[in-house]
Amino acid sequence: MAASCLRPAPTASAQMMTRSPVAGLPRPCSALQRSGCTLQGAFGTFAPQTTRTFVVTWAKGGVMDAPTTTQQPASGVERSQKRPPIYKVLLHNDNYNKREYVVKVLLKVVEQITVDDAVTCMQEAHETGVALVVACPQDNAERYCEGLRLNGLTSTIEPGGC
């Protein structure tokens, strides 16, 4: 009686017919029945295991379709980004603006400059004719130069970095 309640263990071919080796592909049983191909395990026997690899072959033994894998870049890989080119913002001396006004405009237009740096920049422009205000990316340099010009100072930019 106990023997009648037991079912025979599924065979390897029964397991192959019910499971699809790759998600999203047609089940092997229907594809194999239509094409006349055989299904072979890559490791020979079909012992219980977590991963199975199957190869579909033609009757003459040629491989019909080989699995392809795509390698994803490691998540920890950092991509190097190019830094934008650096431009110098130059302040030129003029005989029209007072020194205090030049310092005030420098502090207003260039956010990262300190009072001491603004005074030093103004003094250098007065003594040598030109002074380096700041070296920064091109878009910031153009904005600073335009801001200085709109406030009546003479300013230029040129490529080059520190």
UniProtKB/Swiss-Prot annotation:
It holds the Pfam family ClpS. GO terms for cellular component: chloroplast stroma. Disulfide bonds: none annotated. Residues 1-58 form a transit peptide. Belongs to the ClpS family. The gene is CLPS1. Keywords: Chloroplast, Plastid, Transit peptide. Small adapter protein that modulate the activity of plastid Clp protease system (CLPC). Probably involved in substrate selection for plastid CLPC. HAMAP family: ClpS. It comes from the Eukaryota. It comes from Chlamydomonas reinhardtii (Chlamydomonas smithii). The keyword NAD does not apply. Its main location: plastid. It is found in: Plastid, Chloroplast stroma. GO terms for biological process: protein catabolic process; proteolysis. This is ATP-dependent Clp protease adapter protein CLPS1, chloroplastic.
